[in-house]
From Swiss-Prot:
Name of the molecule in the record: U4-theraphotoxin-Hhn1r
Signal peptide interval: 1-22
Positions annotated as propeptide: 23-48
Primary role: Postsynaptic neurotoxin.
Family of this protein: Belongs to the neurotoxin 12 (Hwtx-2) family. 02 (Hwtx-2) subfamily.
InterPro entries from the UniProt entry: Hwtx-2-like
Length: 85
């Protein structure tokens, strides 16, 4: 009985890990199908970091508290930078 339970739990864990890995590969392949190379993704990341920090600096120069600019598409503004959620 104990061995059967361990075998069932082990199979369930392997199935969950396999399913998760398959979903990651599928999501990654869909991103690559869009045709956006890694260099373009890096440029987008740098652009988001820059925009968020610049907007906070501009608000500080106007003698106002720095209100964090809202970042879109799974990003949030933290420490004057857009970071992935």
């Amino acid at each position: 009985m104990k061995v059967t339970l361990i075998a069932i739990l082990t199979c369930a864990a392997v199935l969950v890990l396999h399913t998760t890995a398959a979903e990651e590969l599928e999501a990654e392949s869909q991103l690559m199908e869009v045709g956006m190379p890694d260099t373009e993704l890096a440029a987008v990341d740098e652009e988001r970091l820059f925009k968020c920090s610049v907007s906070c600096e501009i608000e500080k120069e106007g003698n106002r508290d720095c209100k964090k600019k809202k970042c879109k598409g799974g990003w949030k503004c933290k420490f004057n930078m857009c970071v992935k959620v």
